[in-house]
Amino acid sequence: MLPPQLCWLPLLAALLPPVPAQKFSALTFLRVDQDKDRDCSLDCPSSPQKPLCASDGRTFLSRCEFQRAKCKDPQLEIAHRGNCKDVSRCVAERKYTQEQARKEFQQVFIPECNDDGTYSQVQCHSYTGYCWCVTPNGRPISGTAVAHKTPRCPGSINEKVPQREGAGKADDAAAPALETQPQGDEEDIASRYPTLWTEQVKSRQNKTNKNSASSCDQEHQSALEEAKQPKNDNVVIPECAHGGLYKPVQCHPSTGYCWCVLVDTGRPIPGTSTRYEQPKCDNTARAHPAKARDLYKNRPLQGCPGAKKHEFLTSVLDALSTDMVHAVSDPSSSSGRLSEPDPSHTLEERVVHWYFKLLDKNSSGDIGKKEIKPFKRFLRKKSKPKKCVKKFVEYCDMNNDKSITVQELMGCLGVTREEGKANTRKRHTPRGNAESSSSNRQPRKQG
């Protein structure tokens, strides 16, 4: 976790131009990973209380706490024993980042300090041309970032920031959006700032025809074109999944930073950035969850077009419904245990949730490679036409991450909702199911 004095780094790491790959060789990552295994999990409460002042101006209560922080920032060093001077915070960060600029990040942000050691009210990043207002302890103030000009800073941190001239125009999409006094642990502040890629995506999407759906593939191509232009070395090129979605984890290879994004828009999720390791991301996080119902509508299932796909989905839901009814009716069946059903769910929705819980042995929220095997056997045994079985699991895996979520399973089986009602139609009643007489449905015809 980055020290609080360096709360600019995640924002500015993405503003930096890519540096040669050899800066972060396999040996570098290996060394950092080994350090993490050894130091990052240290339990420090029982360590002797001997304060240390670090090179970034931060005071650590023990050597153990310092080592735990150093595993996240290998360049961190001990400046001297004892507490750091409060007024030297900005000065220490300035000295520290200047050293970083010489060693590793040539375009790292270097703060400006007042004579008393506090942060200057206006801070600028010379390479990108952006300036913004900060509080006396260096935190950015929301809505103050401007390009190639001096921002109008509020008289106090509680004063409402005046909106800058031209706000709301198209060129605002390129300005970094900074947090207003983030709450919580100061050490977590570093992970809350959007990356330059946020603004690149926003800017490119604004240029996309409003009548056409933007996709990661389009953004990827646009970024490649931008990267070819002069002085565009800082362009971040997104990684794409199947179907025009973004991969849930995006990284800036030259700096080692990674963060989670919304898979449908590519927007970074605040509080998720990490360095030298991949964050744990939600593979289904979306800005517009309601649109997920349309993802499978025109998605082709190889070897199973049109009416055949509809017949196949109906046979799968019929078989699953029958299995659930039999399992619930059999007192000796452990698979028949159902949690309290949602009264708004239709039979098909209950069936999918029941079967998903049955497959998700480790309760991880997705069905992995090993957990999916019973589903494949079920499809081969109880569904028809058989030609539709071969590629069905891949068809369900919308983001191509080798696992299936309950939303993906519902979507690929055609069990979706529209305007608060399940988008299903009347179908065959499973034997032995009294409840289904009032809930007989058929999946939406796809393809």
Curated annotation (Swiss-Prot):
Identify the residues that bind Ca(2+) 2: 397, 399, 401, 403, 408
User: Which keywords annotate this record?
Assistant: Basement membrane, Calcium, Disulfide bond, Extracellular matrix, Glycoprotein, Metal-binding, Repeat, Secreted, Signal
Expression sites by tissue: Strongly expressed in ovary, followed by heart, muscle, spleen, brain, thymus, lung, liver, kidney, spleen, testis, ovary and skeletal muscle.
Q: Where is this region: Disordered?
A: 147-230, 416-447
Q: Give a GO biological-process term.
A: positive regulation of cell-substrate adhesion
- Composition bias of kind Basic and acidic residues appears in 161-172, 217-230
**Protein's name according to its UniProt entry:** SPARC-related modular calcium-binding protein 2
